[in-house]
Amino acid sequence: MTQLQKYIWLIDTIRRAGKISLEEISSRRERNKDLSDYKPLSRTTFNRWKDAIFSQFGIIISCQRSGGYFYYIENPEDIDEDELKKWMLDSFAISNLIGENLSLKDRIIVNQIPSAQSHLATLLEAMQGNRVVLITYCGFNKKRSYTFPVEPYCVKLFENRWYLLAHNVSYNKIRIYGLDRIESLELTDNTFKLPKDFSASGFFSTYYGIVTGNDIKPERIIIRAYHDHIPYMKSLPLHASQRLLEEHDEYADFEVYLAPTYDFIMRLLHTGAMIEVISPASLRQTMKEWISDMYELYKND
């Protein structure tokens, strides 16, 4: 287990416990051979890990001295309000848990994410130095690949695929590229200036996923969820802007503010008859057209 994984394990152990003594932390560590070789955690090692965690993650592990010496995360909001940090910590924590339970490998099922590790590492290096990247790319709807320079702005994980948002130098347009469709990628010595007003979260704030474009404007959308789908909508919102308008025995109305792009429409269709678009009328009509086209495929059965 790497040193980073040990730090993540300690953060996760304290987060899940709320408050926990050093003795209990050491006891849990001793039960994990990869972490300890069954040896106790010394106070010196614990303090060193605690300081490293603050240095690397900005996470403060404090001690409550009244009623016993119990350690806790002093600033949990720094984790909960930072989506990237929370995702990273949760991902490492899950990885650690699975690593501790490899004997259950035939009883743990995960979705396969198209490999993007090598490209992702190079792109992050390019983003660190604002360096132009030369990519060879073949889109799903293309018969051949093309090589061109891009200025990498940000990367995004969406529905088990990694995507790159970049400025296409040749077309002078912002485009999105799937990392699993990149055939080759090369760092160049050319650099670029990231626009001062660019914000990755801001750019995607009114989009459902990775389909973007100036031709579709964000708007207020009301979606009605029926029966058993209501708690699913509450527990896993469609979008960060989602809010509950009203709830009844048979249905609940939710509001989102976003651009009704292709991937959002596909998400609504995926839910079937458990939801209904109430407004705007234009999106409701689009849904009717898709449903009508689907009906045509099956009407002769």
Regions found by a protein language model. Give the residues of each.
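Short aromatic/basic micro-patch
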Residues: 19, 149, 176, 255, ...
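Core beta-strand-centered patch of the WYL/Sm-like small regulatory domain
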Residues: 107-222
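Polybasic (Lys/Arg-rich)
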Residues: 205-301
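Bulky hydrophobic/aromatic content
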Residues: 8, 22, 57, 62-139
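Residue-level signal for tight coil/turn positions that link beta-strands
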Residues: 65-66, 152, 159, 179, ...
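General beta-strand recognition
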Residues: 70, 134, 163-165, 253, ...
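Short, hydrophobic/amphipathic alpha-helical patches that form generic packing surfaces
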Residues: 6-13, 89-93, 265-270
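Short, basic/aromatic recognition patches that contact phosphate-bearing ligands
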Residues: 1-83, 293-301
